[in-house]
């Protein structure tokens, strides 16, 4: 939740709704936004990734691993301290310096929090019995007391009683993030009640209700206006949605749902990839749980696609160094976050929002498995160079601007969550290894047509490097 009560997905939904209502504006905006990044003219021809994902795990240095441990552990502190002890609902945002009086939770932050509890239990950061009890409290409350529509949950709610907050929608993607957290717990904890509750929550979700004769999944529903007009019909963080729906043992959707969403082809500096008019997080979220390494469907190798998209994002940031000289090889990364003027869904390419030289740590934190060496350099720089201004009780502040000396006062649950989960995946593959043990997850990916990447499908080629003029600037 933001200072003006709008989330990243709500911002994108509103933008999508505006463009859907005003086609001429959509065309004009597309032309204005793309500048050097261009949408390829044949959207039906899906790009075959030329850089197959590498199964070799990056080896972090001891110094890097110590920092990652610190990042993860402090991020976990958010999910432990800013969750209601009885309901388990995790606060949407909180002061970076410590507890505050806000009481609005987000169901997505709660899903990240459930997964964080698995990681903390495995790494010994908190009493294991207390962790198990917190997981049980969360799943019990969600199943027995949290209001729902056909198994789908409010985006935002009061963390003490679960009642709807801010007139928010019943959100398909945020419920999916919660269900991913629940299924991670089911796979990790050897506890009959946890496994039963997580399974029931997943089985309760009626995916057919979200489709209702359409080819794609609805973004959400409100009692005032029914289903939102915008749908999950183009590449974004959506992949977890159809995969969970395909694997459902109770309300499955047909395999056609996987092919129904568009996969637009983008090109930047002669590098092609599947992209979106959206910030960098769309290339991260589904990858936090689903292991797309070394597998592909008939369209693409999505893990490699995220590597390319992240590489392109870095190049784009460095090309902005003439305007924002703090952007270097050691400091880059923008995604939806706080800004001095409220919450902004910014990033690129193509440019979204009023880029002003800000840095968003979860942009690189959430990209750790894709570019471990290069993202670690950024995280180390922020920790060492900007100190207590950019690093507080729960780790990195949500965003900061070294050019204007502005620092966000808050931490967002989903931003701390994506950093924590992807850091652990980059270090050990822990979340992937456990989440993928769920048979429904395997069935979903099988129904979507995923198979191992074959040598004949890959034609390796170096991804172009870019060095900014300010690369070594101190």
Give the predicted meaning of each segment.
Residues 10-33:
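N-terminal export signals
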Residues 32-40:
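Cleaved targeting-peptide boundary
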Residues 39-474:
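Ser/Thr/Asn(+Pro)-rich, low-complexity disordered segments
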């Amino acid at each position: 939740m933001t200072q003006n009560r709008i989330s990243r997905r709500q911002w994108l939904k509103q933008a999508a709704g505006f463009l859907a209502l005003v086609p001429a504006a959509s065309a004009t905006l597309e032309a204005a936004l793309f500048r050097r990044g261009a949408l390829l003219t044949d959207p039906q021809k899906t790009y075959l990734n030329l850089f197959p994902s590498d199964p070799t795990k990056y080896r972090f240095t001891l110094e890097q691993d110590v920092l990652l441990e610190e990042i993860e552990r402090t991020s976990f502190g958010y999910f432990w301290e800013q969750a209601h002890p009885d309901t388990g609902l995790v606060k949407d945002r909180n002061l970076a310096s410590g507890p505050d009086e806000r009481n609005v939770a987000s169901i997505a932050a709660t899903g990240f929090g459930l997964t964080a509890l698995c990681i903390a239990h495995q790494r010994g950061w908190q009493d294991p019995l207390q962790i198990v009890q917190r997981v049980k409290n969360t799943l019990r409350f969600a199943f027995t007391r949290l209001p729902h529509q056909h198994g789908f949950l409010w985006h935002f709610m009061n963390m003490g009683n679960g009642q709807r907050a801010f007139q928010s929608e019943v959100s398909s993607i945020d419920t999916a993030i919660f269900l991913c957290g629940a299924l991670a717990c089911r796979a990790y904890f050897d506890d009959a009640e946890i496994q039963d509750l997580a399974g029931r929550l997943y089985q309760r979700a009626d995916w057919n209700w979200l489709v209702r004769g359409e080819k794609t999944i609805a973004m959400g529903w409100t009692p005032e206006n029914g289903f939102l007009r915008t749908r999950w019909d183009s590449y974004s963080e959506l992949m977890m949605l159809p995969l969970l729906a395909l694997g459902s043992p109770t309300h499955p959707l047909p395999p056609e749902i996987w092919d129904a969403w568009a996969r637009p082809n983008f090109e930047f500096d002669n590098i092609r990839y599947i992209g979106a008019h959206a910030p960098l997080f769309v290339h991260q979220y589904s990858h936090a749980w689903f292991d797309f390494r070394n597998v592909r469907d008939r369209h693409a190798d999505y893990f490699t696609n995220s590597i390319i998209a992240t590489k392109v994002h870095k190049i784009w940031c460095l090309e902005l160094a003439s305007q924002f000289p703090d952007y270097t090889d050691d400091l880059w990364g923008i995604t939806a976050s706080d800004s001095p003027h409220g919450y902004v869904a910014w990033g690129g390419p193509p440019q979204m929002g009023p880029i002003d030289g800000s840095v968003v740590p979860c942009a690189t934190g959430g990209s750790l498995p894709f570019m471990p060496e290069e993202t670690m350099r950024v995280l180390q720089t922020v920790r060492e160079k900007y100190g207590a201004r950019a690093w507080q009780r729960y780790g990195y502040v949500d965003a900061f601007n070294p050019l204007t000396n502005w620092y966000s006062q808050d931490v967002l649950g989903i931003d701390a969550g994506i950093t924590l989960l992807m850091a652990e995946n980059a270090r050990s593959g822990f979340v992937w290894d456990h989440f993928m043990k769920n048979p429904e997850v395997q069935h979903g990916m099988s129904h979507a047509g995923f198979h191992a990447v074959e040598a004949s499908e890959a034609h390796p080629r170096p991804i172009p490097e870019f060095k900014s003029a300010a690369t070594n600037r101190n």
